[in-house]
Amino acid sequence: MELMETIYNRRSVRFYTEEKVNKDTIDKLIKAGIQAPSAMNVQPWSFGVIQDKALMQKISDDTKAYLLASISAKPYLECYRQLFSNPEFNIFYKAPALLTVFAKPEGPNPSCDCTLAAQNIMLAAHSLGLGSCWI
C-alpha cells in the first residue's frame, strides 16, 4: 500500500473481530513505532502489549472509574459521563490486542515523541489490514 493512500484511508476503528493478532504482526507494529522521529533523537518510548481479555476489561473498568472521578476537576469530560457509566462500554472497544506506548520522562517533549510513535503504529496497522483507534 502506498504511503499517501495509507494516510488518506486510515480511520479509527471501533468494532473488531475476535481474531488474535500474531506476534510477528505485533513486532512489525512496534518496529514501525520505533522508526518515529523524536526530539534530539531521545526516543523516550517503551511499548506494552496486552492480549488477555480479562486484563483488558479490568484496565477499561479502572480507566472509566478514574475518568468518572475526574469529571469535577476536568469539566470537559462531563459529556462522557453517561458513556463511562455504562458497564457495557469497553474503552478499548473490545479490540483483540492493546498496544500501548509509554513515555519515559526524558528529553524535551516525550509525550509528543510518543504520539508520533503511535501514529506510525496506526499507519502500519492499516497497511497490514488491521484496524486501530487512538485512545
Set out the residue ranges of the language-model regions.
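A structural motif
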Residues: I26-I34
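Small-aliphatic-rich amphipathic alpha-helix that forms the alpha element of a beta-alpha
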Residues: G33, L99, K104-I135
